[in-house]
Each structure stands twice: as structure tokens, then as C-alpha cells.
Amino acid sequence: LVFGFGPTWQGSHPSLGTKNALFPLDNLYFELIAVNDDGPLAETVNEHLEKNGESVFGLALETDDIEMAKKELSASFNTDLEISDGKGVNNISNEERHWRNIFIPRKFSRGIFTLLIQHTKGNLPKHEISDESSISRMDHVVINSNDPDGLVDLYKEKYGIRLALDQFVEKWGGRMLFFRTNHTTIEAIGIKKDGSPEDSLW
């Protein structure tokens, strides 16, 4: 077990063609996702696996007001984003969780699978820490970018995540960016290069 404990939630998303296992940490939860059937998300997962193998798939950013997020981001992206309703059933306990989410089109998320989510009903069960060596929190996730200015515009200005550090590192000729949310750092390594703006999770 990578975290020192098992998942507290194992379920499926019939309308999306995927299944998942959730591992709650102090500041977020880590989700393992796999193909379970045919569906729109299953197709995206398969494409990711073919290109990148088993690796970090995407980011889920939580909001307290999905309607306001839709309004503001639709205006920022000059498009009409859609809100979808979701439901999950825990195969371990039969508990249900409900949520509403927005899948951000990749042309706006700059290549990274990103969704905004508002949980509306049900809770993710916590785990009992039986060993002090168990993982308790996620410190940071890393993004590589060829367009740091555009990345700042997306994460700070559009998503509203605090930019805590913006520093040029001469050693490798690029910028180190720290975005902070919920005691978690989204770290970005930005080296300006020609070509279309593109980010990737590392």
C-alpha cells in the first residue's frame, strides 16, 4: 500500500465508464481511476494510458459555488461551460456521494485534464491511522509549462488560486511558480518556448 492504508471508498461511475478508489489525506484526497466500461471519461483515460502510461491523470479543484464558477469561467473563456450532476456508491459500505462538476475543455486548461467539483451530499469516510509512518498529507503537485505567463493567467486570474511565489531561476533559465490552496502547493516549472501553450503534470 503506497500510503500505508487502504482506500475508504471504492465505487464506479456508470455514466462515465470508470471506477475509482479514494484515499483521504488531511488536505485533499487521492483518487485512483480506471476504465470499467464504455463511456466518455473511459475514452479519455485510455488515451492517457496509451500516451503516458500509469501516471498523474489530472486535477480536481473544489469549489463552494459551482454556479458562480460556471458564470465567471464561461465569461473568461468566452464559452458556455456545462455543469453535470454526479453520483457515486461506495462498494465497501453502500454509502452515496453526490456532486456537481464542470469539465474544463483542454483547449482552455492547456492540455491538463481539469475539473471543478462541488460536493453536495455525502461524506468521504476517513481512515484510522494505525502507523505513524503512514502518509497523512500531499505536499505538492508539479506542472511543466512552456508558457509561464499564460499559466499564471489561468491559475491565478481565472481559477482564483493564490500565487505565493514567482521566481526566476537562472540555473535552468525559467520561472518557479507556487500556487497555494488548502495547504497544498501547485508548483510550476515554466520555461518559455516557441509553439502552442502547453502544460503537463510531472
Predicted regions and their residues:
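Glyoxalase I/VOC metalloenzyme domain signal
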Residues: 1-7, 18, 25-165, 171-175, ...
